[in-house]
Amino acid sequence: MKFSRILDILGFLSILGANILSTSCQKKSDFINTLHNSVLYNAHPENSPLSNSQKSTLNITAMDTFMTIQSYGDKKNAEIANQKAKEELLRIEKLLSVTDIESEIFRINHHQNEWQNVNQTTWEVLLEAKQMAQLTHGSFNPCLYPILSAWGFTTGSFSIPENDTIQYLLQFTDFEKIEFKDSYKIFIPQNMMIDLGGIAKGFTGDKIIQILKENGIESALLDLGGNIQTLGTKPDGTKWNIGIKNPLTGEVAASIKVENMAVITSGGYERFFTASDGKKYIHIIDSKTGFPVDNEIASVTILSSSGTYADALSTALFVMGTEKAFSFWKEHRDFEMLIFTKDKRSFATEGLKNKVDFLDDSFEVYWKNYF
């Protein structure tokens, strides 16, 4: 085993973290193109059944991505609500950033083998992350930071680690070893490092929706770096129309009508590198092997009332592959799912039958039911 390479990785991690959340956003006149999904706008606030409904839009860069919050209602009230949502977003980012030396996650990661007092929010999202890891048997895993770093996904200096390095680092990815105490205390063992990039945006979206509700907003749309979350319906009383991208071409392949819903996609097309042998390695890691996932799935979209749940599940079910993903869906029955595969098949759960329109006929559609 080449310990010099391992020590280089662990030494680097001891002084520096990197947030792996990354996205791009391109605006068009009739819809917003995000990394994963599109919001197809047909809302006409002037015809809204909501009294004095006007749109207040907040654009912000946070968690290393571009985000938009659109709230509808009384103009002044919507602006106040958006400002409070912004404050909450920045507060959560400050707590959960893996790079900010003043964040609580950074402190936890750099004080291993010590109990750390944390904010209630940090404690809550870490508990949610561990529970999602348990629920998915490690397909979602918040402890993969050292392995992501070994592959270069935290720095952009990509390389294929030696197998001995991967096997060594896998020792430090056992999420069951994250410990919790009352009064908001957290413990992680030596050499473990937490990265909440696979759940933080969904968790944040849930908190923002809660704040908007508390401030009298009944209609809102969040686009948090490709994570879409909606509050209520559009101002005209109709459902939001969310476009799901064809992961092979970037065009809109399907549209889904939703209200009070998170629509979150994971795909292997947004962060990857191509090695010298021509093989593509994506940023989604299988925690059982330490290697980037290489299966038939091109993207997984989850619909759930919980952004936290949808965010973690979209990654977990991508890792599982199509067959195990649908077995999980049949067992839990508390979300809907749309999968696009590399060989141009699309699999959709039966709960989407009256909600989704397929716009790309190059995909063969398969409907899944509980039986």
Where are these regions (language model features)?
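Mature catalytic core of soluble alpha/beta enzymes
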Residues: 2-11, 15, 19-371
